[in-house]
Amino acid sequence: MVPTSVTRRYQDLASKRIDLIFFESPEWGWKNTAHEVLGLGGTDAEVYVARNLPGRDQHYFDDFDGKRLALYSGYHYGFADFNSDRDYLRQHFKAEFSYSHDSNLLKVLHDRADITVVAESFLQLFLDKNPGSAQQLLVSTRKDQVYHHQVLLRPESPVSAKELGRLLERLRASGELKVLLQRYHLHASH
């Protein structure tokens, strides 16, 4: 395991610092980095989250004009046509950035941001740890994006996509992959 960041991961794969990266999507800025793709078998979705206030409903998420957005730096969001450039997001949306989904949810809860965007799986993990927050949050039924988690590998990685696929298939066949995905509130897609 090698630590990397959201923005550095492209360079790390290209420079051979890492061989593969789990829970990725080729749609998240990988077009200029050589890679192979292997389906992981899990799906997730990004949802909008705001404070649950009297009179506020799902229409609150229809328009972001004038609303303060708490976003994860380097992430690609559907509402912004997957443009992750901070300057673009600040200019076109009232966006502030952090490196913590917990922090972004707390900003919403403490009225320091109006909306954040998080994966449904992360939101459920957050609510597992903070059950009292569930009534305080309004979660959109509209998804920012739905994605199938994948593994991205360097073309000359010591572990080939075919070999990793065989290992994942063994986990899938034994039911272990489904159990692992469910532990993190991910939906098995196979």
Residue positions per predicted region:
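Ligand-binding clefts/hinges and TM-proximal coupling segments of bilobed small-molecule sensing domains
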Residues: 76-93, 169-190
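A ligand-binding cleft/hinge motif common to bilobed small-molecule-binding domains
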Residues: 14, 22-33, 114-145
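Ligand-binding cleft/hinge of the Venus flytrap
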Residues: 38-40, 65, 73-98, 126-133
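Periplasmic-binding protein-like
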Residues: 43-47, 131-169, 187-190
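Short, well-ordered beta-strand segments
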Residues: 70-71, 116, 152
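Short helix-initiation/N-cap motifs at beta->coil->alpha
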Residues: 1-11, 95-106
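Short amphipathic alpha-helical coupling segments at ligand-binding clamshell hinges
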Residues: 60-63, 67, 119, 156-170, ...
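Acidic, polar ligand-binding/catalytic clefts
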Residues: 2-64, 76-77, 141-143
